[in-house]
């Protein structure tokens, strides 16, 4: 039986994996299992994390195969019910949830907190780890054949907590032991961090994830932003001002042209940012139920923020680092801004310096393209 370890041992693990090191730079082309084995060595906790990540990978490979069948497997986009997180559940949402939870039954995981379940699903109450997961991000895109994904975070199961309770999952972002996502697109890719940099894997024809890059870096600056413009009239002034200044192009305070992107699948937007930089914004707004945005802290914002920081990017809630937050609920929502470090810092200044909207000159301080 796997023994749960907490306290100083966990803190030491986080300290020793906080930054990328040459020892963890696995060779391109090796499998995920081999890369994790090299990283874990003889450390018992790391081996538990590695086993859990391998199980997650196995579950996502099943999901990839189901997605590849498309309409041949039936109407995967049909809405079956209203999910516990407050959104309609598609058939593929439920299929994906079952696949990853079944895969994790073979791993040292005490419980799983999923977007598709109200309460955590208990697996092995004595196991040392917890998993928080969005089994299928972007499921509104299923019937249009646009990229969707699976997002996950691995946390320690702290001593004295009931794995079946919500309380066990109410941890700080810095407590995360691993985070990542799988994107199902033209090819299936895995972005993963265990605190030793951000690793990029691609799924080969034989069903193995193989390493593409063990040192992913997000460009510090890029003239591309992703936001749902249809919500413009619901946003607070700092977000409107930031977007207005981007859209003003060379004639505005930014003095450069910007492109806008929006896929309605966070993993797709995140994957583009890892490849070529940019910024993603899903702020809170004035709509009922959207004061704190739409994205979930525990199983969406936390893992993507971990990946971003490990790739020299940044992730904030508008003012503070996402990873400095502590969850207060399994399905807690949070405003989420992430991407190129310099651009995220600039967006933060629009919140922190509202009177001048960051670096705006007086000419633009009270001007907007739509007001």
From Swiss-Prot:
Tagged with keyword Cytoplasm: yes
Matches recorded under CDD domains: FBPase (cd00354)
Subcellular location: Cytoplasm
Residue stretches spanning the membrane: none
Family: Belongs to the FBPase class 1 family.
NCBIfam families, A to Z: PRK09293.1-3, PRK09293.1-4
Protein name, UniProt field: Fructose-1,6-bisphosphatase class 1 1
Organism: Xanthobacter autotrophicus (strain ATCC BAA-1158 / Py2)
């Amino acid at each position: 039986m796997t023994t749960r370890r907490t306290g100083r041992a966990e803190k030491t693990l986080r300290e020793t994996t906080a930054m990328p090191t040459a020892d963890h730079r696995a060779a391109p082309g090796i499998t995920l299992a081999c890369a994790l084995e090299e990283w874990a060595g003889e450390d018992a906790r790391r081996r538990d994390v590695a086993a859990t990540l391998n199980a997650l990978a196995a579950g996502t490979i099943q999901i990839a195969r189901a997605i590849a069948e498309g309409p041949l497997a039936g109407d995967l986009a049909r809405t079956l019910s209203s999910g516990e997180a407050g959104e309609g559940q598609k058939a593929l949402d439920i299929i994906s949830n079952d696949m990853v939870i079944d895969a994790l039954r073979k791993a040292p995981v005490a419980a799983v907190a999923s977007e598709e379940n109200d309460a955590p699903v208990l697996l092995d109450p004595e196991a040392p780890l917890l998993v928080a997961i969005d089994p299928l991000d972007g499921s509104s895109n299923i019937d249009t054949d646009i990229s969707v994904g699976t997002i996950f975070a691995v946390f320690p199961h702290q001593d004295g907590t009931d794995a079946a309770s919500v309380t066990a999952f109410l941890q700080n972002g810095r407590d995360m032991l691993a985070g990542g996502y799988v994107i199902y697109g033209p090819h299936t890719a895995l972005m993963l961090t265990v605190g030793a940099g951000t690793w990029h894997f691609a799924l080969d024809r034989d069903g193995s994830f193989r390493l593409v890059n063990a040192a992913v870096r997000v460009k510090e600056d890029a003239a591309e932003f992703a936001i749902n413009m249809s919500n413009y009239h619901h946003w607070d002034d700092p977000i409107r001002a930031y977007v207005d200044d981007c859209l003003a192009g060379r004639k505005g305070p930014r003095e450069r042209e910007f492109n806008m992107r929006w896929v309605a699948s966070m993993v797709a937007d995140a994957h583009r940012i890892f490849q070529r930089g940019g910024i993603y914004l899903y702020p809170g707004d004035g709509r009922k139920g959207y004061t704190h945005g739409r994205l979930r802290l525990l199983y969406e914002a936390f893992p993507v923020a971990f990946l971003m920081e490990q790739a020299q990017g940044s992730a904030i809630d508008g003012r503070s680092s996402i990873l400095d937050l502590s969850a207060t609920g399994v399905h807690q929502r949070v405003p989420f801004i992430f991407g190129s470090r310099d651009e995220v810092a600039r967006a933060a200044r629009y919140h922190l310096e509202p009177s001048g909207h960051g670096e705006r000159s007086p000419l633009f301080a009270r001007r907007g393209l739509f007001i």
